[in-house]
Amino acid sequence: MKSVRVGCVKYLNARPLIRGWPGNVEFDHPSALCQRLTKGQLEVALVSSFEFLRNPTYRIVNDVSISSDGPVYSVVVAHRGALSDVGEIELDPASETAVNLLRCLLAELGLTPRLTRGTPENTGLPRGRLIIGDQAIRFRQNHARAFQFWDLGEQWKRLTGLPFVYALWLIRPEVPDAKSIAQRLRGLRDENLAGIPAIVSDAVADVADNKQEVPREFLDRYYHKHLRFGFGTREKQGLQTFADLCGKHGMLPKRALEFGLV
């Protein structure tokens, strides 16, 4: 199999899916990876699930995702007071999946805060902030007593009873050896999940080098309790439900998903 151009989100939650990949990997934020995958600058990428909903021509690596079946911890709205009193929420532009999940949840609950990209205007309204990934983890640990945290994974589970799929391995349709790539990625996931202590040790060492303290106990709980790495029947149902709600609320055309699985 020839070398392929692989991209991956640069968050702790992706480590069990990429650690040990034998070739070069280009790490970036989800939105940047989606753009590069669309342009053909990458052939394979672990990107936001919304990218597949928007462009379902990609093939999906079956049985692999970043998902949650309840609280995810690292996709949250930080706010003070009741969420129903929040007048503005500052969005995180790094992930369209998180932004559109938030839009769906708010719409289904009948909440109508103003959603802003960038620093909100000084309107005097109570504010919230959507935070994702490692930034959300650090923010929660540094400001645990100063804010309340509306966990989008938890709210999705309450609303639908289903898991939520945040990211998928997508392969461009013209890549000839997609089945071989998918098989290697599934095998890599299985190897890493069998060795979570090594994943945790690497993560602790890396964040220590960057002067960012993330306790080992938290990481162990994060990988075992908050995250799921499969893409089975219930995850597919969750993704279809997300697509349905995005269609209902005008974020996507209404259509049934056809999963091009490899």
Regions found by a protein language model. Name each.
Residues M1-V262:
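Domain-level signature for soluble enzymes in the chorismate/prephenate branch of the shikimate pathway
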